[in-house]
Each structure stands twice: as structure tokens, then as C-alpha cells.
């Protein structure tokens, strides 16, 4: 099977595929135009998120059997058209959940304590003690919209901060436990001091989080 890798990957994946007698082309710097020219010759495609897998590209991939996504996000892939074409999709849904959970906590702490603003000002010789006072997380209510792998990872890391955690997921029920309370979307909006959004960008979620909605 001929497999094309179009993004930076760990070198071990090439050796692993070649060991299984696949013909591998590793081209992390390839452009979209170049992909369109050569993709008809390939049976497999391994990607990250640089190049959209849209109908134009997929129509050129006449012999494509599968796409392997090295990561969790699928917003750059036309999932419906993959089904129509019968192209299989593999992705690492849990691959970066710990990193995302930690990153989300770091961003929350930075925002609550005005660290980005304070950092910029101190670098300019400005010391605004009162203007940059932060807010403790303890006692606050954190709302999580979307309780998949990333939402759960974030909730797990919040448990030591003395916060109340509420979560809403349109497609899941019965996930509440002693740390996380499952609530409706309206209740989440009404009670949360902080809202953390953990849903993919899809036709359903694009443009959903407006000021009016929140």
C-alpha cells in the first residue's frame, strides 16, 4: 500500500509502516497544490491539521482507502464526504487530552490572575498593583460545555482548586459523579462564573457561542 505523510511526524512511524511492507512517502513540507497532483497514486494519507481534507482534495484521491489523523481534532476533515466515499478514518481521540487539560487550567489561572496583562505592563516598567489584582478560583463555579475526553481531563485537574464543577453535554447523559454535576445548558449559563468550551468546530457549533446565547 502506498502511504503519504504530509505533516511533521515522529520518524518511528515511517519505520513502522515500512516494516509492514508499505511504500511510504514522507513529505512534511508538501504544499496543497503538490498534494493535489500526486494524491491519486496513494492508498493511505496520514495528516495533522495543516491541510483541509475537503471535497476538492478527496475527489482527487481516487484510490484513497484511509486517512490517519495524528491528533484528536477532525474539524479540517469533511466527515460526511468520507462516509460517501467509503474512506476509513483513524484518529487519536485521547492522544492529547492530558496536555489539553493542563493547558486549559493554565489559561484559566492566567486569566483569573490577569497574568498576560501584568506581564506586558511589567516589561514596560509599569507596576499597577491594584489594577492587576486577580481572583481566587476557590469557591467559584466552573462550567464545562462538552464532556468528552478534553472536558473530562479539564474537570479532573480542577478538583484540587476548591471549585464547584458543572458540565453539560448535548450527546451524553448520566456522567455526573461526586466531583462533577451534570446540568442543562441553561443552568450552566446561569450558574457558572467561568465557562470553558470543549466542543469541536462543526457546522452545529460554528457561530453558536454569541454574546446573545451566553
Where do the protein language model's features map onto the residues?
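Hydrophobic Val/Ile/Leu positions in short beta-strands of Rossmann-like dinucleotide-binding domains
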Residues: 5, 142-144
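Conserved hydrophobic/aromatic pocket- or pore-lining residues that grip, position, or stack substrates
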Residues: 82, 104, 125, 146, ...
